[in-house]
Swiss-Prot record:
An example molecular function term from Gene Ontology annotations: hydrolase activity
InterPro entries reported in the protein's UniProt record: APOBEC/CMP_deaminase_Zn-bd, DUF356
Species of provenance: Methanocaldococcus jannaschii (strain ATCC 43067 / DSM 2661 / JAL-1 / JCM 10045 / NBRC 100440)
Organism ancestry: Archaea, Methanobacteriati, Methanobacteriota, Methanomada group, Methanococci
Protein known as: Uncharacterized protein MJ0949
Amino acid sequence: MTILLIRGDSYEKLKNALADVDRHAELTIIGKPKIIVPEAADEILSHILGEVKKPCKTACLAKIAEKAPKAIDRIRKIHPPAHIVVISERYGDIYYKLLDDFPKLPVLKGYYKSKKKDKKKKK
């Protein structure tokens, strides 16, 4: 399991980014995405990347079933309207702290997973 930290200018952009991750990157979102305080998201990002160029206005966390390398590869191919950071076990304390806090966070309202249709092979 991998955690996505999604930072953006509005909740609409976060929801659109989640929809892009689900539909276009074809990553499996587990459960419901949760809202995180923007300052906390910026602090997490500074631990991972070093410098935060622009503070975010809204942020959320989502758990996905896929491993980090696959998630990174697929997210690179799409252009979501928000900044997405993939957080795996590799980040140790940050990853496990987020997993512990995840159930306590408020749910991001207004996001619904797309209904999966049977994918038929194209001829």
